[in-house]
Amino acid sequence: MPLNANFPSKNYDYDYDLQPCFFFLEEENFYHQQSRLQPPAPSEDIWKKFELLPTPPLSPSRRSSQSSLFPSTADQLEMVTEFLGGDMVNQSFICEADDEALLKSIVIQDCMWSGFSAAAKLEKVVSEKLASYQASRKESALSSSSPCQSQPPPSPLKSPSCHGSLSLGGTHRSSHGFLQDPSSDCVDPSVVFPYPLNDSISNASSPCQDLILETPPISSNSSSSESEEEPEDEDEDCDEEEEIDVVTVEKRQSASKRVESSSHSQPSRPHYSPLVLKRCHVPIHQHNYAASPSTKVDYVSSKRAKLESNIRVLKQISNNRKCASPRSSDSEENDKRKTHNVLERQRRNELKLSFFALRDQVPEVASNEKAPKVVILKKATEYAISLQEDERRLIRETEQLKYRKEQLKQRLQQLRNFV
């Protein structure tokens, strides 16, 4: 027969199933139903206005037998959570047991709005329920640590660790007698609450908690479905995962060995010393303006000799660079820059010498040793044009002379014939 949601049941375990869905028009009915289940606190109506949905439980309730007179530990825990709102108590279980200030913060909302009498009552109830819960936690931890130590350690990548393998017989037995078995024999509280509440519990079940912290908490559906699987499949999965780990470790070791071998083999290579380009001295000649005109021929010949020596040095440097070993990019750039500077100096010196030679050929600026390059070019152009005119004039004169010569030869021949 289905239970009616309007009337609360006598059994406390079915209260989560009786909570209706929250709709906009059913808000007053929902709060009215909660007031029937338990007496409201003085400030409960104020806090209900700020809530939307009831907080769901973290784990499914393990229902005890209806014939038992005394409720189990899980039932007492649910009574405390539902009496205090559920949300803040569940947050306090995650914290350490020594943090009593955080546990006392449960009654902060009632202390703000109501008097100290309600706060004292709530503190008393919470302290009693938490003391009983911690005692049951110690007993369950001691009982769960013994099968964990007897079993071999499973693979670290397998999420259902020793808590999931407490006893397969117990899980099958709980499926037959669901309402007759107590909750502590079926579910370990550390599966639902992965964080330890006491130092003694953490020390007792340290090898099991290390495996739990690596994976997220196991839900009730996943634990029940995994308990139905065969142990042979689990062993095969563990073996496959262990093989994968061994392969990865061997690959890492081989890679590290290769790096070490390469580091040892590097000093055996011949060390190539970088080629250093010697700076050749290219003299920047300044014209001796105070010298006499008779020294110009010697000056030009000495300049040509020095330029030839500089060209020889540059050829030697280029040959050495071709025969040298490869170098780094920085040294190559420096060498190229130095070579470019040397060649640029040589080009400038050759250009200056050519201007000096051109100036000596132009009669108008030959005596002016301080003549600028622009004046030298203009005078040289004019002098070239005048030379071309003289050449054409001389060509015409030679042609006239040739014609006159032919005429004289003919006259001489006529005179010889008359004689």
UniProtKB/Swiss-Prot annotation:
Region feature (Disordered): 141-166, 206-274, 319-344
Span of domain bHLH: 335-387
Compositional bias ranges of the Acidic residues kind: 226-245
Domain remark in the UniProt entry: The 9aaTAD motif is a transactivation domain present in a large number of yeast and animal transcription factors.
Name under which the protein is recorded: Transcriptional regulator Myc-A
Basic and acidic residues: bias regions: 248-261
Motif window: 9aaTAD: 78-86
Subunit text: Efficient DNA binding requires dimerization with another bHLH protein. Binds DNA as a heterodimer with MAX.
Spans annotated as Leucine-zipper: 387-415
Cited SMART domains: HLH
Cellular component aspect of the GO annotation: nucleus
Entry's Gene Ontology BP terms: positive regulation of cell population proliferation; regulation of transcription by RNA polymerase II
SUPFAM superfamilies per UniProt: HLH, helix-loop-helix DNA-binding domain
InterPro entries: bHLH_dom, HLH_DNA-bd_sf, Myc-LZ, Myc_transcription_factors, Tscrpt_reg_Myc, Tscrpt_reg_Myc_N
Organism, scientific name: Xenopus laevis (African clawed frog)
GO molecular function terms listed in the Swiss-Prot or TrEMBL record: DNA-binding transcription factor activity, RNA polymerase II-specific; protein dimerization activity; RNA polymerase II cis-regulatory region sequence-specific DNA binding
Keyword Acetylation: no
Keyword list, A-Z: Activator, DNA-binding, Nucleus, Transcription, Transcription regulation
Main subcellular location: nucleus
Compartments, as annotated in UniProt: Nucleus
Its biological purpose: Transcription factor that binds DNA in a non-specific manner, yet also specifically recognizes the core sequence 5'-CAC[GA]TG-3'. Activates the transcription of growth-related genes.
UniProt biased composition (Polar residues): 319-328
